[in-house]
Amino acid sequence: MRTWLWKVVLADGTRTLTTAGRWAEALAHIEEHRGIGQRMLDGRQVAVLAALSHTPTDGAALITMTTPGERWENAVTGCLDVMCRKALRGSAVPLLDRLVEDYVEHQPDQGMTVFDTRLGLTILDLLEPYQEDAAHRMVAELHRRAAVATDGYAARECLADHRFTSLAEPHQVEAARRLVHTCALGRGGLPEPWLARMTEALRGRDEVIRASVGHSRPQQEGLVYRAEV
């Protein structure tokens, strides 16, 4: 439970700060809770992105020292590497070509559709303007994956991306819109029975978190250390 709570504090705090664009504070939050590991997980991603705006050489150094992980981690590392190379005025085209090939050749794991879509859109947006063939391949693959998964969230992510909508065929854009509509996204409410069940689950989780925080305060420092190990 304590390890779980440490992860929640680390992840939710980081997500809140980065969503607000407060990257320096997000990095300080992660460092305070010892959340920067050797693999390209949330903490290390934030550290690289925080460095990009001021000292991209530090971001590049973090990438170089990153321990390879699962395929999706390596893809994220590749995207951040491209961003660092561009910030340092270096060539990123060969790396972008590899990212496109790897994305098209490997299908997403179960439960990773939205993440996979965001990854694909990131690669698409990083492509140079003259990489038109690669960009059209990415758009076609993103459209195909959202359609096969019948995932409205994935379709909505695609529609929110300007480069996707500017390159996609009209029928692809329309298909994505129909999928979002079919999945009832943006309707503004939940049926009352579902809302009641969700409220009950959230209330129970709130009680568990408050009880855990109250019991763990006297030994907080030891908790953080053990959670990191």
State the predicted function of each range:
Residues 2-5, 39, 113-115, 190, ...:
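Structural signature of alpha-solenoid helical repeat junctions
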Residues 36-39, 47-57:
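Central/C-terminal regulatory/activation regions of fungal transcription factors
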Residues 1-8, 27-35, 40:
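Short, flexible helix-coil linker/hinge segments at the edges of structured domains or between repeats
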Residues 142-229:
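C-terminal functional modules
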Residues 9, 13-31:
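Alpha-helical protein-protein interaction scaffolds
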Residues 53-179:
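Long, charge-rich C-terminal accessory regions
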